[in-house]
């Protein structure tokens, strides 16, 4: 199987952490769309949003998704990548989409534990727990709609990787 694997889910679900280790375990290349975009522009996500607003960032995010999609690649996407219909169809049609699902309490705890690792401009202007709740309520149905595989991301990364590998094996053997 050489299809790209797209990891989707909200901030703090473990897309980058799991993605790097998953790519290593599958002997694949790893790319994080946000990191790729930031390195191409030499700007942070916050800088891009400040300069181009969210619409400009979302357009660049789509271009990044297309640019990094390649066989034998694990791709960690930004949490809002599913907001654009083109991106949802693109991922579904060009690879296997894995939704790393976690409840609000877990996401908030992870984001508070390492706030500097995931600096993003606020989407709502609300406190973190309220924002995570609101954003997840808005996006969960889209994550589920686009996903080929849904994984409980509350476990340790090694367990999440094991579950993804098992699900991939079942998907391939259908």
Swiss-Prot record:
**Subcellular location(s) of the protein:** Cytoplasm
Q: Which residues bind Mg(2+)?
A: 16, 32
Q: Which GO terms describe its biological process?
A: amino acid biosynthetic process; aromatic amino acid family biosynthetic process; chorismate biosynthetic process
Q: How is the cofactor bound?
A: Binds 1 Mg(2+) ion per subunit.
| The protein's Enzyme Commission number | 2.7.1.71
Residues engaged in binding substrate: 34, 58, 79, 139
Q: What reactions does this protein catalyze?
A: shikimate + ATP = 3-phosphoshikimate + ADP + H(+)
Q: Which parts of the sequence are annotated with region: LID domain? A: 112-126
Q: Which Pfam family is one of this chain's hits?
A: SKI
- EC class, as a word, reads transferase
Provide a GO CC annotation, any one. Answer: cytosol
From the UniProt record, give the pathway where this protein acts: Metabolic intermediate biosynthesis; chorismate biosynthesis; chorismate from D-erythrose 4-phosphate and phosphoenolpyruvate: step 5/7
- Give residues annotated as binding ATP: 12-17, 120
* Keywords noted in UniProt: Amino-acid biosynthesis, Aromatic amino acid biosynthesis, ATP-binding, Cytoplasm, Kinase, Magnesium, Metal-binding, Nucleotide-binding, Transferase
Q: Give one GO term, molecular function aspect.
A: shikimate kinase activity
Grouped into one coarse class, the protein's main location is cytoplasm
Q: What SUPFAM superfamilies does UniProt report for this protein, alphabetically? A: P-loop containing nucleoside triphosphate hydrolases
Task: Give the protein's cofactors.
Answer: Mg(2+)
Assigned protein family:
Belongs to the shikimate kinase family. AroL subfamily.
Assembly and binders: Monomer.
Quote the entry's note on domains.
The LID domain closes over the active site upon ATP binding.
Q: Report the function annotation for this chain.
A: Catalyzes the specific phosphorylation of the 3-hydroxyl group of shikimic acid using ATP as a cosubstrate.
By what name is this protein known?
Answer: Shikimate kinase 2
**Taxonomy-wise, where does this protein's organism fall, top ranks first?**
Bacteria, Pseudomonadati, Pseudomonadota, Gammaproteobacteria, Enterobacterales
